[in-house]
Amino acid sequence: MPIMIKICGLRTEETLDAALDLGADMVGFVSFSKSPRHVSLDLASHLGKRVGDRALKVLLTVNADDASLAAGIAALDPQMLQVHGRETPERIASIRARFGLPVMKAISIGDYSDLVQIPLFDAVADLLLFDAKPKAPGGLPGGNGTAFDWSLLRHVETRKPWLLAGGLTSQNVAGAIAATNAQGVDVSSGVESAAGVKDLAKMAAFIEAARKPQLSSQRHLS
């Protein structure tokens, strides 16, 4: 199965077009005012129109209420919602039922105890995202450039597909995929020159590196 690649936190036409040209499967737009990657509803609408059918548009929110979700959906017209806060399994089910869109639930992992919640979300979400837990209480829930102990995922079995996030760069993504058997990867700060500023060269290097394990496997099988 091809590795899914998501570039998150896109904020400009140039970087969005680059992500699409490079073959990203998903492009993420952040609707969370505390994030340096936050986009207004108007900008989300403008950028969303450029995507067409070249990738899945993902709206990322954090503990958003129904009104905020409805506004973001109306602006971006996403194919998927990503919830990256303290949303409960019941809240995930409610969002899916109300808006009729697939939901990706981000799960913050710091140690073994954080794995307990995974089956609860696996039962209600359409896709899971395993990310590093913020080091500081009240810190941004994602996009911090820190990784967690990937060996913890050896203990995880899910029915739903999942993406790996947290501290991924072009230097470590191939190893991360090999170590975890991740079905996909999600990157934001790892392809930036500054917080919220995507770097075209880093984006290209990341996607090339993420595809390498798959290409090597295909050559070996042939």
From Swiss-Prot:
Keywords: Amino-acid biosynthesis, Aromatic amino acid biosynthesis, Isomerase, Tryptophan biosynthesis. GO terms for biological process: L-tryptophan biosynthetic process. Pfam families: PRAI. It comes from the Bacteria. GO terms for molecular function: phosphoribosylanthranilate isomerase activity. PANTHER family: N-(5'-PHOSPHORIBOSYL)ANTHRANILATE ISOMERASE. Belongs to the TrpF family. HAMAP family: PRAI. This is N-(5'-phosphoribosyl)anthranilate isomerase. The lineage of its organism: Bacteria, Pseudomonadati, Pseudomonadota, Alphaproteobacteria, Hyphomicrobiales. The gene is trpF.
